[in-house]
């Protein structure tokens, strides 16, 4: 009779910053999801050129380590660590209402992962998974506009044509 020890180990491949300026892929065993957890198979993962560039180059100031920590980061700055916060995937295991759903999660770059079920956000109908990875950047753009507090009819100049700058411009163009 098979025992739980006979169950094959599920492996994930994760991107680790092994040392400042050097990334590597590592195989990691996944824990079985608990009753309030999901196992997600990643479809897309976005790299934040600005933030993750700072992390890769070891340029995160020690005073900012706490604020720069990603929700499911493993390891500590400057390295070794597993970093990232823009993953879209499909729930493979977990509560029936989430199984098979495409979801967004603030998770590092990894092929599969287990997180609390309330850490994933199901994608709205019609939102392509490849675009949904921009959710973290869109949140930054929304916060920038909230902080700027534009009024009706204000002219807004966006300096910077990166992903966040383009999203700020896109949102600003839709303001009254």
Give the label of every model feature segment.
Residues 8-14:
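Short structural boundary motif marking the start of a folded domain
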Residues 118-129:
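Glycine/charged-rich beta-loop-alpha catalytic/anionic-binding loops adjacent to active sites
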Residues 18-21, 34:
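Residue-level recognition of beta-strand termini and adjacent short loop/turns
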Residues 104-117:
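A structural motif shared across PLP-dependent enzymes of the aminotransferase-like
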